[in-house]
């Protein structure tokens, strides 16, 4: 934990935990909202597929562009822009499922922009000899948030309902963005000589030229795709269980 003595890195970790808390609430509330609106596992699968599409197709394009930009500005604005988008989900998304899918897609694009930059700036915030420790702490924070925040998110959604959970999620993104605004400047280290499309092509070319990397990515993609379909079928019973929990919590509140 010595690495937390660096104030900028400690601020990054704090923003990460706040953002992760909101993301877990968002994940649970979104699935509950979709099921309440449709009572159809197909729409749950479409939501998961929309998220996967944003990550697989646009993440390489965003990463190549982000390399040449002010990374602090991207970190801050990718959080601040998610705040109004997530707040619109219960307002617009609940009225129109296509609008809901669009909001989910935009949220996923901002996440794909934010998360790689967040990991990439760690060496700029700590000494070189402490980079491994800092990365390990980020990984630990991710595992802790997965264990603690998902369970808490389920209870919160059951207690206040998905709509209010989205508003709380919006506040966490706002808080995270404000925390990140206190980071030191994070300019690109060096502007690459190659153009944007050339860098995208180079990254994709590396994927296709390396059989081991290609097989690994293909396996992960297939697992994610089929896993999303499988999870969509499982979500029906899981969300029904959550509905029962919601009813039990409602009775306790009375």
Regions found by a protein language model. Give the residues of each.
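Alpha-helical transmembrane-bundle signature of multi-pass membrane transport and export proteins
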Residues: 1-238, 244-246
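Hydrophobic alpha-helical segments, chiefly the membrane-spanning helices
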Residues: 239, 247-254
């Amino acid at each position: 934990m010595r690495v937390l003595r660096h104030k900028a890195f400690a601020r990054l970790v704090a923003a990460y935990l706040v953002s992760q808390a909101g993301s877990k609430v968002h994940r649970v509330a979104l699935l509950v909202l979709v099921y309440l609106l449709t009572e159809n596992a197909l729409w749950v699968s479409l939501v998961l597929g929309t998220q996967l599409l944003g990550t697989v197709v646009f993440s390489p394009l965003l990463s190549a562009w982000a390399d040449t930009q002010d990374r602090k500005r991207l970190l801050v604005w990718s959080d601040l822009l998610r705040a109004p988008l997530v707040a619109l989900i219960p307002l617009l998304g609940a009225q129109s499922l296509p609008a809901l899918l669009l909001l989910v897609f935009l949220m996923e694009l901002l996440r794909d922009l934010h998360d790689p930059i967040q990991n990439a700036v760690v060496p700029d915030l700590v000494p070189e000899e402490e980079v491994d420790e800092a990365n390990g702490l980020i990984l630990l924070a991710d595992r802790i948030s997965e264990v603690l925040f998902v369970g808490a998110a389920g209870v919160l959604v059951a207690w206040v309902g998905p709509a209010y959970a989205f508003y709380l999620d919006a506040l966490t993104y706002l808080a995270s963005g404000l925390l990140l605004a206190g980071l030191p400047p994070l300019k690109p280290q060096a502007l690459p000589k190659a153009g944007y499309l050339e860098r995208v092509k180079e990254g994709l070319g590396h994927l296709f030229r390396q059989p081991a990397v290609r097989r690994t990515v293909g396996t992960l993609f297939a697992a994610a795709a089929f896993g999303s379909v499988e999870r969509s079928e499982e979500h029906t019973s899981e969300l029904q269980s959550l509905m029962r929990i919601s009813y039990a919590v409602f009775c306790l509140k009375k």
